[in-house]
Amino acid sequence: MSKTVHYLKDYAAPAYRILKTDLHFDILEPQTIVKSSLTVQPERAGEPLVLDGSAKLLSVKVNGRAVDYVLEDEKLTIAGVPSENFTLEVETEILPAENKSLMGLYASGGNLFTQCEPEGFRKITFYIDRPDVMSKFTTTIVADKKRYPVLLSNGNKIDGGEFSDGRHWVKWEDPFAKPSYLFALVAGDLAVTEDYFTTMSGRKVKIEFYTTETDKPKVGFAVESLKNAMKWDETRFGLEYDLDIFMVVAVGDFNMGAMENKGLNIFNTKFVLANSRTATDTDFEGIESVVGHEYFHNWTGNRVTCRDWFQLSLKEGLTVFRDQEFSGDRASRVVRRIDNVRMLRLFQFPEDAGPTAHPVRPASYEEMNNFYTMTVYEKGAEVVRMYHTLLGEEGFQKGMKLYFQRHDGQAVTCDDFRAAMADANGINLDQFALWYSQAGTPVLDAQGRLKDGAFELTIKQTIPATPDMADKQPMMIPVKTGLLNEKGKAVEFEYQGKRVKEAVLVLTEAEQTFVLGGVNEPVIPSLLRDFSAPVTLNYPYSEQELATLLAADENEFARWEAAQTLYHRAINANRQALAEGRPLPEHKALMDALALVVSGDFDPAFRAILLQMPSETDVWAEEENIDPIQVHQAREALLNAVAVKFLPQWRELNRQAAEQENQADAAVRYEYSPELAGWRTLRNACRAFILRADAAHIEHVAENYEAMAQNMTHEWGILSAINSNESEIRDRLLTKFADKFADDALVMDKYFALIASSRRKDTLQQVQTALNHPKFSIENPNKARSLLISFSRNIPHFHAEDGSGYRFIADKVMEIDRFNPQVAARLVQAFNICNKLEANRKAVMTKELQRINAQEGLSKDVGEIVGKILNEK
């Protein structure tokens, strides 16, 4: 397999630009004929014109005349083109129904959809398919009216008509220049849900959501989420929508979550369709977040886009930050923040510590699809959040305004964004640039002491070596800090000439001491409040100090962090006891702290999240020679101990939560709202503990299942809690669930995820059986993710000592890679942990990776990842 590596340092501006793109799609059966007419502007006259493409080429003309060309390795090269502006016409043929990669133009459910980011447009026609070539598009679509009554593309509809043979046509015009990755087309038999939004300047924007007729009743929440996002972006950022219409199309076969194509967003059905019987509260929150994210891209991604794909985080990190802020304003801000940090630690921290570690702005890539990563998105959002922490809301908004003033309508870089933030605030952010170029999660080791009426806090930063770079420079790291006395009361201190209760300490050196003055009593530092930087922080807290932080810190994130540290220590104590064959410890400090959590006055959503232990991945994050089963057993033992210790309290909290839900009006009792969602989350946490502590309770669940499962949040909570039970009751209830929702594709995804995440002895066998379930298709990304990626995260079964879990996932990676490399590449990342495993498992996993690597015709997507794992030192 030949490798082409692309390097950031090799960037060169395009030799040609495309001022105008006129597309004509003639949708036939089975082929679609695509004609493009491009107005091309030479930037460096004399150089050959090179276009990207993999479609079947029918003809090429320059200024109306056929020309000679060379077509090789998906590059179309035309020499001797005019030195002044000229017209290039290209005709191609594509077969959407045969396109199983779901990139370019493809068929799903009898309809046609596109996905062009990052390099799907070249599957449709030949083009300068890179984000810094921005063009104004018009698109004409011709198709059979009965088969394809709906014909959509970007921008505003400007013309249309019918032919005598039963075919019809529509012409769309996008008045804003855009790169090819933002092109979209949809053709099919779809139902529309309409609404309107009036912008802050008084313009009336039409909103259209397209789904199947059956799914039409499930789009209401997504429509309201869009209107809320449009209003929020005006209020928070002063950004107004710029077209006459905003369209969203939902499709069940989709590689990603959603795509922000200008004026015509295409969404995975998972992030559009919901009602309380089929979607959990978490699903509703996901819809709100993703709808917001894609809408916010209209300015941060579309109006200002990326110069090249190395700059992907310019649009994605910034837009994730914006959607996180939107979600934080819609519900409990601290709970949403904790959710974001948990995801970062669960997925991005391991990525930063593994063979595929890369900076927020990668320096090189083989396959661009592989860089739609947690690092680029979630760590990228944390980088943007650090600007906000350093500059404050006012300073951040000044930077955003300057960014748009300078760059509206341009394709720019992460450095351009940093320059806007720095220049708008008169601050030097040169050192901050290292967040874009250095991979790895910084580790902060802190020590504190009381000296001469001040608290001295010394912080040492270490950035671990990563495959791309061994030696790292000290970074600019904001550490939001407060102090508590031994009774838990906030202590004021002097910093930079002010008397404050909280300060942002900016670490810029490898080791630095901060002096917090006017402190005359023993204090407990509350560090990295609100997770002010994406780092790992170590401080030698005593268990009593952690208990004080959990009980009394004014910063709720810091309270949660203290609980996580107590859990972490308890799990590790269990590991030690299990390894030495000793009885498990009683964990008095943790149990005393949890007694406060279960009995104190807490917001229900916050209480529920305090009860969630760190995952196994969190526990072993900084370790080598990992035995996953040992960590899993230690964590399970702690869960069981907590369940038994507080069984009466779980029952009482469950009763209180049910009472709160029942007090709501019957019409909305089981619908989504942030308040009721908090009570339901707490109730599901209590149910899980009750079922752990009281084995007989499953019979009560079986007898009262219908009464208890009043919406999907309850039903999912119950099934998750009994999912690892070996009794026939679990099988019976899961089968009943599948029968009830057999015709709902998204709920069946939940069913397959339950099967794959069970800890029962027969889980692998049940997963293999599910592959042949009539509602399962391995070609559907949602189904593949729900069953296979869920299984790859099942610690005891994926890491089974006999290697059966590794072998099974390797087989599926190779199978999927033949038709959808993008999904296969996501699945193969389960093997990223290989070189951190203990010797036996490492050897078994390495053998499976070598087997994948030897597969004939292995895609670049999978080959790049496997190669990095096998070559990791």
Task: Name every feature range the model reports, one short phrase each.
Residues M1-I33, Y106-Q115, Y127, P131, ...:
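N-terminal, polar/Ser/Thr-rich
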Residues K35-V40, G53, E84-N99, F137-K145, ...:
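Short, hydrophobic/aromatic-enriched beta-strand segments in well-ordered soluble domains
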Residues S37-K56, Y127-D129, S135-D144, D415, ...:
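Surface-exposed beta-strand/loop patches in extracellular or lumenal glycoproteins
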Residues E43-A45, D52-S108, D129, S164-D165, ...:
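A surface-exposed beta-strand-loop module
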Residues E47, L57-N63, N428-Q431, A439-L527, ...:
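Beta-strand-rich binding/interaction modules
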Residues E91-E194, V219-F221, F432, E556-R559:
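Extended, low-hydrophobicity, Ser/Thr/Pro/Gly-biased non-transmembrane segments
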Residues W172, M200-D452, E456-I459:
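Hydrophobic alpha-helical and helix-loop surface patches within well-folded domains
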Residues T373-M374, V515-K873:
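Long, ordered, helix-rich scaffold segments
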